[in-house]
């Protein structure tokens, strides 16, 4: 069985459609080459909230594709969202508040935790 994971990042922008669209595009346009060929993630949902000024994006794919798309989404959010200008009803900690990796098929929570640590290190570096 192929490994499939889900990522549900929360971005600190829920009002500016142009910024939201650019972040989602960065995620959706990401491709990775694996032993199975070129892969992309599938964006399942984009849920902006005006009052909270936050958007939740849901996407799935192989661990390699999800990790790269998550990195590219976080990178684009950090580039476009000015937290000094951010106001919303929901507490926030940065342009990307949370970036969870969730096992869907053929994988475990422990594997997702390892991938999350790898992704966090890449973002930090």
Residue map of PLM features:
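Long, contiguous binding/interaction regions
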Residues: 1-125
